[in-house]
From Swiss-Prot:
<feature type="binding site">
    <location>
        <begin position="153"/>
        <end position="154"/>
    </location>
    <ligand>
        <name>UDP-N-acetyl-alpha-D-muramoyl-L-alanyl-D-glutamate</name>
    </ligand>
</feature>
<keyword id="KW-0131">Cell cycle</keyword>
<keyword id="KW-0961">Cell wall biogenesis/degradation</keyword>
<protein>
    <recommendedName>
        <fullName>UDP-N-acetylmuramoyl-L-alanyl-D-glutamate--2,6-diaminopimelate ligase</fullName>
        <ecNumber>6.3.2.13</ecNumber>
    </recommendedName>
</protein>
<dbReference type="GO" id="GO:0071555">
    <property type="term" value="P:cell wall organization"/>
</dbReference>
<dbReference type="InterPro" id="IPR036615">
    <property type="entry name" value="Mur_ligase_C_dom_sf"/>
</dbReference>
<dbReference type="Pfam" id="PF08245">
    <property type="entry name" value="Mur_ligase_M"/>
</dbReference>
<dbReference type="GO" id="GO:0009252">
    <property type="term" value="P:peptidoglycan biosynthetic process"/>
</dbReference>
<feature type="binding site">
    <location>
        <begin position="111"/>
        <end position="117"/>
    </location>
    <ligand>
        <name>ATP</name>
    </ligand>
</feature>
<keyword id="KW-0460">Magnesium</keyword>
<dbReference type="GO" id="GO:0005524">
    <property type="term" value="F:ATP binding"/>
</dbReference>
<dbReference type="GO" id="GO:0000287">
    <property type="term" value="F:magnesium ion binding"/>
</dbReference>
<feature type="binding site">
    <location>
        <position position="459"/>
    </location>
    <ligand>
        <name>meso-2,6-diaminopimelate</name>
    </ligand>
</feature>
<feature type="short sequence motif" description="Meso-diaminopimelate recognition motif">
    <location>
        <begin position="408"/>
        <end position="411"/>
    </location>
</feature>
<dbReference type="Pfam" id="PF01225">
    <property type="entry name" value="Mur_ligase"/>
</dbReference>
<feature type="binding site">
    <location>
        <position position="463"/>
    </location>
    <ligand>
        <name>meso-2,6-diaminopimelate</name>
    </ligand>
</feature>
<dbReference type="InterPro" id="IPR035911">
    <property type="entry name" value="MurE/MurF_N"/>
</dbReference>
């Protein structure tokens, strides 16, 4: 839906040299369309004022910037100085797009692991319950099942509001949204109204950005102090979650969830059983108990299901309906996806686990389902937190019977150096198999597996590429695994 608004409506307290109608607010000069206002602020490597000429060429009708301008960058005579512009962008975008987050029931999900699964499972559940639901996160934006990639877990503040408006205009009545620590720290969700905030867990990740776990946790906690928030769903099996729960605003409806019988939990899983068919447990919501039989794999998916249950309860869905819909939820692409497992082929699981905690959870969960060996294919991303590399090696060595180290988006970093960092975490490095070619590593793992083994391919999940030296090459773990499984499935024997 096309929009237009007078600049004076967006900046009523700013003296404008002349008023103009603007049809959009854009920070990227490359995506400016005729009629847009170009917002020139400091980026990570450059200032927007250096790209005014390109924005003008693309049809920008106004240029806004935050003073003072950097030394050496000319300021166009008709550019409009807006003090505190960066901090105002959320409110401006919210107003321009007609306050989209207020028109839908908004659930924000934050945490190190489980954001994507929780968002997708929640959107799936609400859709099954008859509420058209949009998603915004790692897997893209769109109504459930029709998401288109954005390239961000949480986009920048201007596109975030534009995408929420898009979801509203497409008919979404609710939105499940991933809210990363970067987004909270950088103001990407400024002026987004959330009804429910969900916390999954806090483990090591993004310390290349936050520096310390305390700062990382503080960024996550910002989601739970937002004005207008009605309910908080918090994992009480997580240490930081318990701290967050204890320090909550007393006027906030707080829903603690636990699969480990925490006393303060109002939503819990009891009598938990995992088998080759999935997960079985009794869902207890404030004393009302209903059975759940889920086809999902992995102990950590119990936590994801409980987070979904807590969010649904916060949205006033009845416990019996919640239990029924939890049993209907299907796996999310790239999250504990199953391949093989029949006709003589091993069970192969593709998962996004790319942090020490996520890898440990994936392996320990699959151990509960395994009849024989557990084979793990994993790597570590280049130009990211190097401290987690030896940690992931130690976890793979402890929890898997066979560990195969391979490439996982080396980016601009030397792949051999990444592998060397990983190998330092093995007590017996000679026992690890190194095969940097990821496709070859997947084929090797499946070739060595018996029908009673499980192969975990960890790290990339839904990603359709392998990034090497700044170039994203088409690559999909699930497709490669399916190709490797084909001879086993057809012949019923090890190739």
């Amino acid at each position: 839906m096309s929009r237009s608004m007078a600049l004076s409506q967006l900046l009523p307290d700013v003296a404008l040299p002349h008023d103009v109608q603007v049809s959009g607010l854009v920070m990227d000069s490359r995506t400016v369309a005729p009629g847009d206002a170009f917002v020139a602020i400091a980026g990570f490597g450059a200032h927007g004022l250096g790209f005014v000429e390109q924005a003008r060429a693309n049809g920008a009708t106004a240029v806004l910037f935050e003073p003072p301008a950097p030394d050496g960058l000319p300021v166009p005579v008709d550019a409009i100085a807006v003090p505190g512009l960066r901090a105002r962008l959320g409110v401006m975008a919210d107003q321009f797009h007609g306050r989209p987050s207020h028109a839908m029931r908004m659930v924000g999900v934050t945490g190190t692991n489980g954001k994507t699964s929780t968002v997708q499972l929640l959107a799936q559940a609400l859709t099954l319950l008859g509420t058209p639901t949009g998603t915004l996160g790692t897997l893209g934006v769109g109504l459930y099942g029709a998401a288109v990639s954005t390239g961000f877990t949480t986009p920048l503040v201007l596109p975030t509001h534009a995408l929420l408006a898009q979801l509203r205009d497409e008919g979404a009545q609710a939105v499940a949204m991933e809210v990363s620590s970067h987004a909270l720290d950088q103001g990407r969700v400024d002026a987004v109204h959330f009804d429910v905030a969900v916390f999954t867990n806090l483990t090591r990740d993004h310390l290349d950005y936050h520096g310390e776990m305390a700062q990382y946790g503080a960024a996550k906690a910002k989601l739970f102090t937002r004005p207008g928030l009605k309910a908080a769903v918090v994992n009480l099996d997580d240490g930081f979650g318990r701290t967050l729960f204890a320090s909550r605003d007393p006027v906030l409806r707080a829903i603690g969830v636990s699969s480990r019988a925490h006393a303060d939990a109002s939503v819990s899983a009891q009598a938990l059983q995992l088998d080759h068919n999935g997960i079985n447990f009794a869902l207890n919501i404030q004393g009302e108990v209903h059975p759940v039989h889920s086809p999902l794999l992995g102990r950590f998916n119990v936590d994801n299901l409980l987070a979904v249950a807590g969010a649904l309860w916060a949205l006033d869905i009845a416990p019996a309906q919640i239990a029924t819909v939890l049993g209907q939820l299907q796996p999310i692409h790239g999250r504990m996806n199953r391949l093989g497992g029949a006709h003589g082929a091993p069970l192969v699981v593709v998962d996004y686990a790319h942090t020490p905690d996520a890898l440990e959870q994936a392996l320990s969960s699959l151990r509960s389902h395994a009849q024989d060996r557990l084979i793990c294919v994993f790597g570590c991303g280049g130009e990211r937190d190097t401290g987690k590399r030896p940690q992931m090696a130690a976890i793979a060595e402890l929890n898997a019977d066979v560990a195969i180290v391979t490439d996982d988006n080396p980016r601009g970093e030397d792949g051999d150096a990444i592998v060397a960092d990983i190998l330092r975490g093995f007590a017996r490095p000679d026992a690890a198999i190194v095969q940097r070619d990821r496709a070859a590593a997947i084929h090797q793992a499946i070739a060595m597996a018996s029908a009673s083994d499980i192969v975990l391919i960890a790290g990339k999940g839904h990603e359709p590429y392998q990034e090497v030296a700044g170039v994203r090459h088409a690559f999909d773990d699930a497709i490669v695994a399916a190709q490797a499984l084909l001879p086993r499935t057809v012949l019923g024997v090890r190739p």
